[in-house]
Amino acid sequence: MVTVVNTLNRPRHPEKQNRPETEVLRKPDWIRVKAPGSAGWSNTAGIVRANGLHTVCEEAGCPNIGECWEKKHATFMIMGDTCTRACSFCNVRTGMPKALDLDEPQKVGEAVAKLGLSHVVITSVDRDDLTDGGAEHFARTIASIRKLSPGTTIEILTPDFLRKPGAIEVVVAARPDVFNHNLETVPGKYLTVRPGARYFHSLRLLQQVKELDPSIFTKSGIMVGLGEERNEVLQLMDDLRAAEVDFMTIGQYLQPTRKHHKVERFVTPDEFKAYETVAYAKGFLMVSSSPLTRSSHHAGDDFAKLRAAREAKLGRI
């Protein structure tokens, strides 16, 4: 269980301090993972620390950090470690963020080059305090990676840029290889799970990326186990396909602390497999659906499969 208070004894989630504690369900055997600590993990951690960078792997308490960092795979989280939203599922710190580090795009590019990454994932906190939501910072980071590690393919996992006109255009113009924006949950759960966001705005963002540049792969993911119904998940799949989203991820929600949204149930591996089968039938080029699936887990391998799936589809037309 991840603590709600950081090492300086400041509340990590001040908005959650007065919430009642919820029951934490015991994890089934299929959720358990090996603790990190290998030599590869230590090397990746050293490069991240040396460049003063943040990763969503650490900040969000991802269960796959040991596996990914051992392979020198890390998802860099730009624009600081403090988010202006307060989603009930998320372990990232909430509060008023610091000013942007204008050297961060260069630092990320250097770290990508040092790690020798063939594929990198860049995400960020929400920055509602910035006039463009951080769009230009994303674009500069993409440009830095292109310059310092030209052979690396780039996947971005963005916030929703709600009420930030022109932001999406700036990011798309930087031409990432994959544009990911997670819906996170079904629309009926937004009020309690993702109250600062709007389902149809997020859906429209994904659609707009395709309209602006059809060559960019689009991707979106959800968590299950939050109390959603199966039919709601199937409708969400239809919504994503209507927006021409190429790649869908589905993973089990894991509760960071007793103050966060509770896990209503653990979805079985067979149910995840069934979701995968239905999603492929609905036309997604790529689907990753398993208890430990996360947006950037196996992202490099999945990108290669995604590209191959598009080429195969075009070859049949």
Curated annotation (Swiss-Prot):
The UniProt record lists the Radical SAM core domain at 69-285
Spell out the GO cellular component terms annotated for this protein, sorted alphabetically and separated by semicolons: cytoplasm
Ranges for the region named Disordered are 1-22
Does the UniProt entry include the keyword ATP-binding? no
**Residues involved in [4Fe-4S] cluster 1 binding:** C57, C62, C68, S296
Q: Which GO molecular function terms does the record list?
A: 4 iron, 4 sulfur cluster binding; lipoate synthase activity; metal ion binding
Question: Which pathway does the record list?
Answer: Protein modification; protein lipoylation via endogenous pathway; protein N(6)-(lipoyl)lysine from octanoyl-[acyl-carrier-protein]: step 2/2
Paste the cofactor note: Binds 2 [4Fe-4S] clusters per subunit. One cluster is coordinated with 3 cysteines and an exchangeable S-adenosyl-L-methionine.
State whether keyword Iron applies.
yes
Localization recorded for this chain is:
Cytoplasm
Report the SUPFAM superfamilies cross-referenced here. Answer: Radical SAM enzymes
Known cofactor(s): [4Fe-4S] cluster
Q: Which reaction does it catalyse?
A: [[Fe-S] cluster scaffold protein carrying a second [4Fe-4S](2+) cluster] + N(6)-octanoyl-L-lysyl-[protein] + 2 oxidized [2Fe-2S]-[ferredoxin] + 2 S-adenosyl-L-methionine + 4 H(+) = [[Fe-S] cluster scaffold protein] + N(6)-[(R)-dihydrolipoyl]-L-lysyl-[protein] + 4 Fe(3+) + 2 hydrogen sulfide + 2 5'-deoxyadenosine + 2 L-methionine + 2 reduced [2Fe-2S]-[ferredoxin]
Biased segments, Basic and acidic residues type = 12-22
User: By its UniProt entry, which CDD domains does this protein fall under?
Assistant: Radical_SAM (cd01335)
Where is [4Fe-4S] cluster 2 bound in this sequence?
C83, C87, C90
Q: What Pfam family is a match, any one?
A: Radical_SAM
**Taking the first listed entry, what is the main subcellular location of this protein, grouped into a coarse class?**
cytoplasm
Alphabetically sorted, this entry's keywords are: 4Fe-4S, Cytoplasm, Iron, Iron-sulfur, Metal-binding, S-adenosyl-L-methionine, Transferase
Q: Which SMART domains match?
A: Elp3 (SM00729)
Top enzyme category = transferase
**Which EC numbers does the record give?**
2.8.1.8
NCBIfam families membership? lipA, PRK05481.1, PRK12928.1
Family, per the entry? Answer: Belongs to the radical SAM superfamily. Lipoyl synthase family.
> What name does UniProt use for this protein?
Lipoyl synthase
